[in-house]
C-alpha cells in the first residue's frame, strides 16, 4: 500500500493523492458473482428526485458479497484481493474446499493464499467468522450482525471495526469507532479483525470531475436558490437565509436530533461522541 501525490501537471492533478495497492487484482472480476446495477439518477418510479446529489458516473456491476458467512466448517483459501467500486473497502475472492467461490470484505492484513473459516469452532484469526458469544472480550471485530442470520450491518467500510468490551447473558456490548457503546445479541456473527484499506480516508480526488465519475452531483446552498426551492431561498442580494438553518423541507439541520427509532434506544448504552 503506497500513498502517491501526483505532480501538478494541471490544475486538476495538483491536489490529487492516490492510494496504490499493488496486491489488488488487475483483471476482470469473477463474473458469476456480478449483478447488473442500473442507475436511476436518484429518481423514483414517478420521475421525482427522492435522493439528492445522485446522477451520472461510470457504469458499475454490483459484486455479490457474502455478509452472512454461513458456510461453516469448510475452509476457504483467499485467491485474490479486488477493488470494489460500490464500497470503500476492498473485497477478497475466496475458494472453498468444495469448489464454491464467494466474495467477502477483505480484513486488514489478509493476503492471497491465506485461509479463512466460519463457524462456532473457527480459530480466533483475522478473517474468520464466529458467533459473538465465541469471541473473547477485548477482541476487535468487523462485519457485525445486528440480528442473527440477517447478515453483517455494522463496521463494513474501509478501516472500520468494533471492540467487544463486555458480555452479559444474551448480549455483548460493543464499542464502535464513533464512541457509541451498544448491546448486540451474542448469537449474531462477526468477523475477527478490522476492515482493510484504512488509508482510504487519506485520498484526495483533486477535482470536481473525479467526484462526478463516482455518480455524485453538486450540493447547492439553500441561500443560492429561489424561495420555491428552499426555505433559505430568495431575497435581494446576498442574504444569510433569515432563519436558523433548515433542510429543504423545513427541518432544523444543525444539532437537531432526528432519531425516531425509540424501540432500540434500550440497546444503546452510551451515545456516540459529538
Swiss-Prot record:
One of its GO terms (cellular component) is large ribosomal subunit. SMART domains: Ribosomal_L2, Ribosomal_L2_C. GO terms for molecular function: rRNA binding; structural constituent of ribosome; transferase activity. Residues 223-274 are annotated as: Disordered. InterPro entries: NA-bd_OB-fold, Rib_uL2_dom2, Ribosomal_uL2, Ribosomal_uL2_bac/org-type, Ribosomal_uL2_C, Ribosomal_uL2_CS, Ribosomal_uL2_dom3, Ribosomal_uL2_RNA-bd_dom. Keywords: Ribonucleoprotein, Ribosomal protein, RNA-binding, rRNA-binding. One of the primary rRNA binding proteins. Required for association of the 30S and 50S subunits to form the 70S ribosome, for tRNA binding and peptide bond formation. It has been suggested to have peptidyltransferase activity; this is somewhat controversial. Makes several contacts with the 16S rRNA in the 70S ribosome. Belongs to the universal ribosomal protein uL2 family. Part of the 50S ribosomal subunit. Forms a bridge to the 30S subunit in the 70S ribosome. HAMAP family: Ribosomal_uL2_B. This is Large ribosomal subunit protein uL2. The lineage of its organism: Bacteria, Pseudomonadati, Pseudomonadota, Gammaproteobacteria, Vibrionales.
